[in-house]
């Protein structure tokens, strides 16, 4: 049995058909108990929609289901996976990245230094984890953050990314280098040595990268650190740099390039290959992704 309490919310019944169809595609078994529109279940998870619109999700797998499907695809709100941003009033640097899971576009690492008198201002602006914000809002907030705080962004465009990756042979080591470089620059600007990082690998990976730069840092690494205001601000700057970079590449090749690494990504990649050739395709993507092999292997078949 799950030790987690059931997740309960209210759903607009206009979305019931989409939810049902999605759950069927995800392999849920469907029944229709009394007073429900349906109840869907599979190992570790049950999702029940009542005729009143009450939606109940329970089971040991509920957190992943809610965070990665229900909230972004159905509810379009993020109260479960991204609760209210925490306010730590100690001046510190927050670091986050964007683009590591995206086939097209740059890898961007951003850092933001927040002083004590800036926390309330950022909170009033609505700064929070970029994953909960639209691209339009991200761009608006990024401009305001840059006007208010010290920041640094490491933007690694695909051609440079592929070159550096050949040296590191490991994405986490490349990310650690980018994090350490960002931290180094913000320490030089601010003098602050207290840093919070959204953890992406074993703690030793970033610590080693900092050691190589001879940086003495009071470092905290933790998962989902975007609940810290400085990290949330950094996530916005990193995301803004990424979406701007992706948009610029799309304009250059006159083909809309999607985020992520999905079937839509492969479709766009095949179009780039047909229109511009393999060399140009390689110059705008992260070549170690298996997506590239899929694109090159399927084109022409």
Swiss-Prot record:
Disulfide bonds: none annotated. A divalent metal cation binds at residues 96-97, 198. PROSITE patterns: RNASE_H_2. Manganese or magnesium. Binds 1 divalent metal ion per monomer in the absence of substrate. May bind a second metal ion after substrate binding. Pfam families: DUF3378, RNase_HII. The keyword Hydrolase applies. It is an enzyme of class 3 (hydrolase). It comes from the Bacteria. One of its GO terms (biological process) is DNA replication, removal of RNA primer. InterPro entries: RNase_HII/HIII (IPR001352), RNase_HII/HIII_dom (IPR024567), RNase_HIII (IPR004641), RNase_HIII_N (IPR024568), RNaseH-like_sf (IPR012337), RNaseH_sf (IPR036397), TBP_dom_sf (IPR012295). It catalyses: Endonucleolytic cleavage to 5'-phosphomonoester. PANTHER family: RIBONUCLEASE (PTHR10954:SF23), RIBONUCLEASE H2 SUBUNIT A (PTHR10954). Belongs to the RNase HII family. RnhC subfamily. This is Ribonuclease HIII. It comes from Protochlamydia amoebophila (strain UWE25). The gene is rnhC.
